[in-house]
């Protein structure tokens, strides 16, 4: 079996475990593609992506085209003569001309069990919709949105305490073995492809900040899922008077309530109990504007009184 010349394309932290594995494998990681540096933070200073930082630390050449609409960027990739391109959360659309450059094509590590949750936010949508399991799919890329033939899947349970952050970390780590297995299969010309059933496809649209506001007229379970799906970003919130109150952790209870959804039923060391469309939700960790995340217990001990029984959260 021949060693493969690999080009990697990715931007956020999700791809780092696979990069660590690639550089220790028998294959040759020739270059890394990542999105251009972006302004970030209060100072709006240019910030390198986690993938770029990794590549610099490992002395791997980095390429950061704005897109692949110009021929120069396409020619630059072609000159690397990759056998395969591994794409993980790159964030740029790859046109047909790019997909055809690697001898064995471009393969994508996608954070869902395709064809369920094609699109930009599969992890958040798995939690939002109460999926019992999630996983990663290694697929051959085509010009569609996560529509290509599948090479490998790995599954894991989604627990009742999983947040988008914890599920992200689990899937990032578990993607390593299936990726290496697929590379070995490609190198030995033994890869097997399974077409996706488009009739089973669901789409995970991009999550935005406007969706983060809690609707207390939903059920306690639905609100709990939203809080977990929107942690660590953009973080679900409600209005306590005129203050934005971010909710980082909560759980649905079996306590029935006939009060108006959004009414605070009780605040004690266990948390803040809030009425919903059915059972009450126990809010455990909160964050006021300009303050740190704090448990309701610690907030109570600080002597503050903005949250109290009878308060209507909006």
Curated annotation (Swiss-Prot):
Membrane-crossing residue ranges in chain numbering: none
Catalysed reaction equations from the record: L-methionyl-tRNA(fMet) + (6R)-10-formyltetrahydrofolate = N-formyl-L-methionyl-tRNA(fMet) + (6S)-5,6,7,8-tetrahydrofolate + H(+)
EC number: 2.1.2.9
Keyword hit for GTP-binding: no
Residues at which (6S)-5,6,7,8-tetrahydrofolate binds: 112-115
CDD domains associated with the record: FMT_core_Met-tRNA-FMT_N, Met_tRNA_FMT_C
Record Pfam families: Formyl_trans_C, Formyl_trans_N
Disulfide bonds listed in the record: none
InterPro entries: Fmt (IPR005794), Formyl_trans_C (IPR005793), Formyl_transf_N (IPR002376), Formyl_transf_N_sf (IPR036477), Formyl_transferase-like_C_sf (IPR011034), GART_AS (IPR001555), Met-tRNA-FMT_C (IPR044135), Met-tRNA-FMT_N (IPR041711)
Single Gene Ontology MF annotation: methionyl-tRNA formyltransferase activity
Keyword Ribosomal protein listed: no
Annotated keywords: Protein biosynthesis, Transferase
PROSITE patterns: GART
Gene Ontology cellular-component terms listed: cytosol
HAMAP family xref list: Formyl_trans
Family: Belongs to the Fmt family.
The protein's role, per its UniProt record: Attaches a formyl group to the free amino group of methionyl-tRNA(fMet). The formyl group appears to play a dual role in the initiator identity of N-formylmethionyl-tRNA by promoting its recognition by IF2 and preventing the misappropriation of this tRNA by the elongation apparatus.
UniProt-listed NCBIfam families: fmt
Identification of the protein by name: Methionyl-tRNA formyltransferase
Organism per entry: Legionella pneumophila (strain Paris)
Gene name, Swiss-Prot/TrEMBL: fmt
């Amino acid at each position: 079996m021949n060693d493969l010349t690999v080009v990697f394309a990715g931007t956020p932290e999700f791809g780092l475990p696979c990069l660590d594995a690639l550089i220790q494998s028998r294959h040759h990681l020739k270059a890394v593609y990542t999105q251009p540096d972006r302004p970030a933070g209060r100072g709006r200073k240019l910030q390198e992506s986690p993938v770029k930082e990794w590549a610099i630390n490992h002395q791997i050449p980095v390429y950061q085209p704005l897109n692949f609409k110009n021929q120069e960027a396409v020619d630059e990739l072609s000159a690397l003569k990759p056998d395969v391109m591994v794409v993980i959360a790159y964030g740029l659309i790859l046109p047909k001309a790019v997909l055809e450059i690697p001898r064995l094509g471009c393969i994508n590590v996608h954070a869902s069990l395709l064809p369920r949750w094609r699109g930009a936010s599969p992890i958040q949508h798995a939690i939002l919709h109460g999926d019992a399991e999630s996983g990663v799919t290694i697929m051959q890329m085509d010009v569609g949105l996560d529509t290509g033939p599948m090479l490998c899947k790995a599954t894991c349970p989604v627990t009742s305490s999983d947040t988008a952050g914890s599920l992200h970390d689990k899937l990032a780590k578990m993607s390593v073995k299936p990726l290496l297995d697929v590379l070995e299969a490609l190198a030995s010309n033994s890869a097997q492809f399974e077409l996706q059933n488009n009739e089973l496809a669901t789409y995970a649209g991009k999550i935005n900040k406007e969706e983060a506001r809690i609707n207390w007229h939903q059920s306690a379970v639905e609100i709990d899922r939203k809080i977990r799906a929107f942690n660590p970003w953009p973080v679900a919130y409600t209005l306590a008077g005129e203050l934005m109150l971010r909710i980082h952790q909560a759980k649905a209870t079996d306590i029935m309530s006939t009060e108006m959804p959004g009414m605070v039923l009780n605040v004690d060391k266990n948390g803040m109990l809030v009425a919903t469309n059915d059972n009450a939700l126990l809010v455990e960790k909160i964050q006021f504007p300009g303050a740190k995340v704090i448990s309701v217990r610690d907030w109570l001990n600080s002597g503050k009184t903005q949250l109290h029984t009878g308060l209507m959260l909006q």
